C-alpha cells in the first residue's frame, strides 16, 4: 500500500471540480480518488516501473502545483508530438524527469515519463493512472 509523507492540506470535491473546469477535462477516477486521499507528497519507494524499466521517483505535485505547472512548460520543453496543453504534470523524479497525464483525445489518461536534458525524451509509459499507481516498488 502506497503511503505518502509531506502532503499538502486535503482537497475538497469543490476544489477538484474547479480544477477540472480550469483544465476543461474530467480527470480519471483513479487520479481523483488518489488526490482526495493525498494532495501531493512523497511516497517511500525505490521507484516505479513500466513494462521494461524501473524509474526513479521523488514526489507527487499538489493540486495547486499542478495548476501552476500548466504555465511552466512550453512546447519546446516537451517530447516530440506534444504541446504544453497536452500534458498535466503531476510528479517528478530527483533530477530532470517528469511524470505527466495525457490530456489529448487520442491517448487521454495515459501516463508518460520523460526526461528534459538537451531535448525531452520519452522513457516510460503506463496505460492509465491506476496502472501507474500499481507499478510502484516499495522500499
Segments and roles (model prediction):
Residues 91, 102, 112-114:
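Residues in well-ordered beta-strands of folded domains
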Residues 117, 121-139:
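Compact, glycine/acidic-enriched structural inserts
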Amino acid at each position: 500500500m502506497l503511503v505518502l509523507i509531506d502532503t499538502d492540506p486535503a482537497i475538497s470535491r469543490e476544489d477538484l471540480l474547479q480544477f477540472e473546469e480550469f483544465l476543461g477535462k474530467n480527470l480519471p477516477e483513479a487520479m481523483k480518488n488518489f488526490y482526495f486521499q493525498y494532495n501531493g507528497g512523497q511516497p517511500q519507494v525505490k521507484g516505479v516501473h513500466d513494462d521494461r524499466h524501473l524509474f526513479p521517483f521523488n514526489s507527487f505535485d499538489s493540486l495547486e502545483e499542478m495548476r501552476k505547472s500548466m504555465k511552466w512548460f512550453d512546447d519546446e520543453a516537451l517530447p516530440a508530438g506534444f504541446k504544453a496543453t497536452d500534458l498535466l504534470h503531476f510528479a517528478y523524479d530527483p533530477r530532470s524527469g517528469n511524470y505527466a497525464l495525457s490530456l489529448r483525445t487520442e491517448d487521454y489518461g495515459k501516463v508518460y515519463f520523460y526526461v528534459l536534458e538537451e531535448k525531452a525524451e520519452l522513457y516510460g509509459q503506463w496505460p492509465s493512472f491506476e496502472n501507474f499507481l500499481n507499478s510502484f516498488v516499495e522500499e
